[in-house]
Amino acid sequence: MVKRIIKDIRMKPLDTPKIYYVSRPHYNEGLTAITPIQTSHIAFHFWSNPDRKILHHPDSKCLLEFDLYTCGTLTHRHIERVLHHLTQFGPTHLNLTLLNRNLSLTIDQQSTWDKTEMGWVDWIEQFAK
């Protein structure tokens, strides 16, 4: 998935993705991955047994924190492609923050999605407009 994301957003990998399984402590169990790209990195942690109190939706079964850092340019179309890749995880809730690292660290956009309000694919298409 990470290799396809890098290709879709037209970034250049510096190495292959490194993926690790974390088993302890139990509440932190899941996959951790990082991939360096020419303009920074992509990292994520996928918790398979998170504390239920931190989940935002009653149907949520796991938690994914996905970070794409780049000093390059990402369009809404690029971000739409990344979000489509996350469809395989069956998202139920999303907090999205776009930070501009060009001159300083400023928030360009914050968005929240919940499956009770709108379908995932519909929200992605609306986001990309």
Where in this protein do the model-derived segments appear?
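Polybasic/polar functional segments that serve as interface/processing modules
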Residues: 1-129
